[in-house]
UniProtKB/Swiss-Prot annotation:
Role played: DNA-dependent RNA polymerase catalyzes the transcription of DNA into RNA using the four ribonucleoside triphosphates as substrates.
Subunit note: In plastids the minimal PEP RNA polymerase catalytic core is composed of four subunits: alpha, beta, beta', and beta''. When a (nuclear-encoded) sigma factor is associated with the core the holoenzyme is formed, which can initiate transcription.
Cross-referenced CDD domains: RNAP_beta'_C (cd02655)
Cofactor details (free text): Binds 1 Zn(2+) ion per subunit.
Domain of life: Eukaryota
Organism in which the protein naturally occurs: Bigelowiella natans
Cofactor: Zn(2+)
Protein name: DNA-directed RNA polymerase subunit beta''
Amino acid sequence: MEKIFFNYPFNKGKLKTLLIWSILNTGQYNMINLVENLKKVGFQYATTAGISLGIDDLKTISTKYDLIEKTNDNIKDITNHLNLAVLNEVEHSQKLINSWQKISEILKININKKFKTVNKLNPIYMMAFSGARGNISQVRQLIGMRGLMADPNGQIIHLPIKSNFREGLTVTEYLISCYGARKGVVDTALRTATAGYLTRRLVDTAQHVIISQLDCGTKQGIFLSNLYQGTDILLALKDQLYGRVLGKDIKINSLMYLKNQQIDDSLSILLANHLKRVFIRSPLTCKASNSTLCQLCYGWNLSHSKLISLGEIVGVIAAQSIGEPGTQLTMRTFHTGGVFSGNVKSQLYSPFDGIVEYSSSLYGDIVNLYNGNFAFLVKRKGLIIINPIIKKIKPKKFEAILYTLVFVKNNEKVKKNQLIAQQSNKISNTQQIEGKYTVNSKLEGEILFDENHLSTNKKKIWILHGKIYKSVFPLQLFPKKNDFLSYKFPLAQAKLLNLSASFLKVCVVRKKRHFIKDNISQSNEILLFTEYPLYKFLIKNIKNYHQFQFFYPIQNKIKEVEKSLRINNKVIKDNRIKIPFNSIAKSKLLNLLNKRLEQNTFFSKNTFSNYYENTDERTTWFTQNSILKYNAIYFYKSSKSVEAKTSRKIPITFNSKNFLIKEKLFFIKNNSVLLPIFSSDFFTKFTLKNEYFKPKHNIQRKLGFLSPTSYFKYISNNYFLKYLNFYQKHISVEMNDIIKVKLYYKQEFEEKTNFKKQNLHKIDSKINLFMNKLILVIEHLILTKLFSTKINNINYLLFYFNYLKYLKESNKFTIFYCNKKKETIFDLLFLLKTLNTTSNLIILAENKISTKLLSEFIYQTIYLIKNNITINSTNSVLENFNYFQQRKEDLFQHRNIFEKVPNFSGKRFSNLSLNINNENYSISKAENKMLIQDLLTLTILNNNIKYFNSHKSFLDKRFFYNESLPIPKILKDFTSILNRINFWSFSSSQFYKKHFLFALKTDNLINIKNKNFIFISRIPQIQAVNFALKKSLKSSFDLKSYEILQYNLKFPLGFYSLIKMIIEERSLFDIDYFQKFIIQYKNFSFHLINKKLKNIFTNNSYGSFTDESTLLESKYFNKRRPTKTTFSKLMNQIKFKFFIKVPLLLSTFSKKDTVLFNIFITNKKENFRNYKIVNMLTNDFYKNLNLQTHSSEKNSQLKLSSKNLEIFNLFYTSSIINVIMKKSITNFNKNFFIDNLFQFSKTHFNWLPKWDTIVRIQFLSPYQGEIIAQNIVKYSGYKTLYNHLMILTKNEKLQVSIFRNKNQETIIKKDTKNYFITKPHCCKIYPKFGSLIYSTSQVSPGKKINQSGQIIEKSNSFLVLRKGTPLLSPITGIFYVWNGDFVSQGSPIMTLLYNKLKTGDIVQGIPKIEHFFEARKGNVDLIQTNLYIKLLAFFKKYNKTLSEYRAVKRSILKIQKIIIDGVCRVYCSQGILVSRKHFEVIVKQMTSKVKIVNGGETGLLEGEFINFQKLEKINTNLYHRRVVYEPLVLGITKVSLRTESFISSASFQETTKVLSQAALEKRIDFLNGLKENVILGKLIPGGTGLIVKIITNKI
């Protein structure tokens, strides 16, 4: 056999070709023998040659040190330029890196030359340049210099490693280079893990893809062409065609190649040579069923070079082929040289010293490079000639091709190794990215802009050194500019004031009693005041006082009063509750009705009980009959009419506005009444003998004062006053008072429209809308076993003015029977706005309910008016009923409060029946079926309910809520009422407004045992509805309800139903004061809309009225702005450790204390309560306020005289409330009580009168030096201003002599005892006082200084310099400072913008592959690379001209090509060749689903993901409304989780979620894939063997 000699190097590629040829032509056996022989030959010759590597083979380069020295000199110059602000930081960095990079490149060239000239057989040279091991850049590190390194962030460290491995590294260089080594180790570990996970995901994605048939019959396919990276071919067409199948007939040179012909090596070369793109069959377009593939679409099995076998599991093969090379890919590479290194081949260095000359044909432009330098860009070819200075050397010519950059001018001298030119491709915009570099201050000081340079391009910014003193609080500082401070000099003083005359105060937060756990947290509050009053003024003189942001009255007189009170020991007043002065916001736009704004100030601590604890048994402070009066529980009402003139252009109708105001009055009054109840709680020796509280009068009294109030309201503006007087006179009213009430009403509402009730027997479920547009009709189906069989399924229609009756009896009331006693109780249904079908009186007897528990109503409540008449007095009830009916008609039209009027005195029902005294059952509707709770709970309730006994005048109630009703969230224009039952102790209520409802999550049973406790429901979000209900209740409250209100006022969000109502009322007013207030209710925006008003008001969240509150963000008294006061906003302002008093003042409190309660939770937005000031401050402010407080036997009237208030001190807002010792109050749940615990200690010193100073706090100077500047700073997010000082200490100054020699300075001659001082001649001093000088400038003849700065002192012999650092201001950039600002060390000064070249994508290797395969939507990267966005863009583009099916098809093909090309580029750029068909198998799975946009007739849901092929089959069978869909690209993780097999998905990730979802959907797993069969232990549906059926004969 003739031997063949190959005369060229036999590298890896040639070896691979030889082996493939061998296996194809000679078979596997011979190929293995060939490989064995090659191995032997290789080892034999390697042994014979004996190449080894010793340290002697590392020959260093002698020119290296000269180069480094020159570069060091160059770098010194660059650094000086930076210090003189000639360069900015970015230019400095680029010049440094360029300098070192240049050396590195020169050394590389020299190494090459040295090896070639000295010893070509040097082992290192042989290894590196033969490609056997290593490359030139590694050799450079061995014997040249290692060069620049990157830090862990990828930033280049400016200190290069000058040594090489032959010489050894210094300690510093070793540490710098460590990062690279560590990174390599970490990368290797991470790389294998990441590649393994990538493989796992890919396998899960495609494990079910199997070859199932020979030919699927498709006519579709894809075009293949060369894959380019820029202009280079990354993957040639012939390599892609090998092993594929033609998709159509192709004719080349009269030869026809048929469709379905397999492409071997020779055919692939032929096709690639003749065609730019070839149409072939592809897995992407295969039509085989069940996500399988056919043999022809797949092509060859590349390991055998023949068509793939049937049953081959190509999905797993594809996944492993892609994942396995992943370990060879780099995770992330930081291109250290990147931006700054040119291409080695493309740079031209001068070979010797000489003069550069250009040929005349050289043509181009001057360009500004990305590193800031200028160069000449060649646009027409020419020559560069270097003429040597030494004549003996021949000149050298170089060709300058297109786009060469030339750095040297014509005829300029160049030195050896100077860079002359550099080839470059044209830099497109896409290759440039804008870089940002933030310059941070290296020291603290003051910014100064150099005005002298403003005209030039090179502007300078100076940082003049100095120490900054920042005040912790907004304080007034004692020293001024130019004062000298000594160390620890007091700069400011603040004092801590006691807010209220009190003992040591502790806030205890205790969980409600129904909950076992007690969370107790304490906070001590501190108020800081600076001692600088800013202004003193008489309030009379201030008209526009809203200009002032801070308002604080100082009441010295009160202090004295308190002290004297304390001495008397009769009454200790807690002045915390002084009425705040209120401000009215006037508006000129008020034309509606009367211009009156009523301000209500509530001070109530709702769930705040007051405790007194004595550590000492002896109560030294109180005599036995004394009482501690807690005004904290007052509801103070200060109502002041401003501009009482009315400009009525409309007749007064009794509209909701008016009645709201009326309600307010009631509310107020009751509050004052309630007061005493509180106080007696803890002093057992007190008995309340106040006649108003005698139980027998409770009910009547209510009636008594109810009507007159409303009556007076229309008579005079001073109704408040009269109302109080009236109240004092009336004690009891007998039952027949009801008729009087009626008369009052008639007088009031003279314009009546009577609405007749209609019986809508025939209407089954229609919606009737009646006037006021406030009608919501709810159809409700109640299914309950409790009902008698007659009314088992009933639709209830609720109408605004309709009475809907489904019962067969035509009575106007329903009769219920109580099983036990067979007593008949008449329920009078009082229809105000709506009659809710049947009223629901509930009588509970022995755990059974004879009547139905639920009815629903909307906007109205059902009045259960119990006459409290015993069963036999039926007649009287009937009479009353008629009366009521009339009344109902009267009241109806005025949607007003009086609905509640019906109250009767009389005896209660027997214990077993439920005693309802003015009880309102509000029944709520949910949109789902109404749950009627197990009624056992109710029965329990019944047994425990006790209302006012004849003995007690205290509350002892339970409020019951149905527990755990399933309720969806409802948010509708009109109220729909939630599914729950409330027992309120008020007669009834009515809605006149739209409310938004929020769903309740859980309700629970509320128990009110103590007079002082009010119910709190643990309801996360309470309904507006309930509030509304309460609203109307006012008129007939009885004491109980008031009490409740009182307590409730402060509930945190969840529980205020009561409160809200009250508040709401209060905050309504007739005039369009503030155009619109939107108050946010938790996360819902909650608007109450009144018919004729634009106002939107009331923040029920806090049981306070925020409606008129202006936005706190603006100046505090800015009244015209529509507010969106969300609670969160307020809290943000308050959110630092101390609470700045200013916003508090705004919050209707002159009483800091109350506010403190609210604040005590800083972290929780919900718990803060917003107050605002709404009353005008005038001297007669308190005249109308004649508050009656009943305490003990005496009537002590609290009269606040206005005189004290006339003089105010306006303080700078330095008041701060500090929550000190805050413990565990981060999460303040709605089911908390807040109890104020007053501990009386044994020592008398713990008693502090109000406004006493607790402690003085001094703020001391940390530095010694001169104050040279003062700044007032406002931090974003804070309302207050802070004082900052700039202090110049010794270290920041430099004293410089103006003389060159020391002996030139002042000489003192000693002559006996006389001293002679000889002055040297005066030198001329160049710089002026205050001027800025640089470190190189002369200060006097022959004298330079080495420090930049500003001259701040000048004398005959020396200058004093304030040190400074100049910075070059960029032409384009972002500034963060202004002239005169103080900057601390490390704070940003400016951001420099510059362009740099892209160095290839920083994301390399596996992360880049994941980017394609995961197709994440929310990727932070640019929109251009987001696959999902690209896909939608393609779809929209094609959808304009094509059908939906074709648009989806084409856009998917497009995105498939992008993904496959992208992944191929990553692998090819790393030198790894993976067949394209593997990517196609995976990508097909990623794009096989589409997203439903509209299900059409199919019932498919919007947003579902459906297989594209299946959906098209469905669509072809639809004729009318087809399915509308859009294309989808899913990442491999999502594909794995959404496979047809839930067993496969569950074994991948999120097992529980996948299995539970599959169970709920009742999915069936058809076990088509491998994985699910393996898991279940079944045969897999794949494999290339033969399936032989074994038939056994039955024996």
